[in-house]
Amino acid sequence: NFIKNENANIVCLQEYTERRRENKPPAELVFKSMDLDHFAKSAYFKNKEVARLFIATFSQFPICNKIEVHSDHRLIALITDIVVEKDTFRVFNVHLQSISFNDENYRFLMEAQQNISSLQSDSMQQDSKKIFWKIRTGFIKRAGQARLLREIIETSPYPVVVCGDFNDTPASYAYHTIKRGLTDAFMEKGKGIGNTYFGNLPKIRIDYVLLHPKFQCQRFQIIKQTISDQQNIKA
């Protein structure tokens, strides 16, 4: 309902699940009821029989082209070319590598925050090494993914809009690599710190809308909701 209330022209979802055994209409039918008649979607994992996780873009305007971007066999972006009257622009719906923490990792972090002295134990030191390597691996993978997207952005035949979940902060290499030459909608019209992640880690801004200089941002909003540990953004 909150998407319907926003009356958006284009909606980019980085993760949504369709369960084949549930008696529910597919997402494209739901969005058509919001006048978002055009869509493109791609599954992260092609062989899931019960539930499939998708990245998807829904639009009030015609979509004339769809491109998947993969890095190390992982889907990291869905590109769509959208036609508005006589103009075409390219939307990058992006979902970069996460740090892939599991429940055990989060429990370790909570325990470490509550009792710093516990980090001296052998088991806690082993757990801290696992955390370090996951963070390091995430940074390295996002850096490569960002460079790949940068190359595609620079060769785009149309003005671009880049949006999505970068899983990284505004100080990161990934953010600055992708943002080069683009305008951050939050920096133009946002207010406050702009945090979009409210999970078990420190609150940070990891979701972005970046615009080609041809576009002018009129407003930016973080949409408060409780169905996820990340907030939705609107520009």
Question: What is the role of each PLM region?
Answer:
Residues E49-A51, S117-S123, R147:
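Short hydrophobic/aromatic-rich motifs at helix boundaries and adjacent loops
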Residues N7-L13, S128-F132:
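Acidic/histidine-rich, surface-exposed loop or edge segments in extracytoplasmic proteins
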Residues E22, D72, K134-L148:
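Soluble or luminal CAZymes and related metallo-dependent hydrolases
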Residues E15-T17, F132-F139, V161-G164:
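Second-shell loop/turn segments in exported
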Residues N93-G138:
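Active-site-proximal loop/helix segment associated with metal-binding centers of metalloenzymes
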Residues E68, D81, I140-V161, F166-A235:
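Metal-dependent phosphoester-hydrolase catalytic domains
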Residues I10-M110, Q216, Q221-Q225:
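Structured beta-strand-rich core segments of catalytic domains in phosphoester-bond hydrolases
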Residues N1-E6:
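N-terminal signal-anchor transmembrane helix
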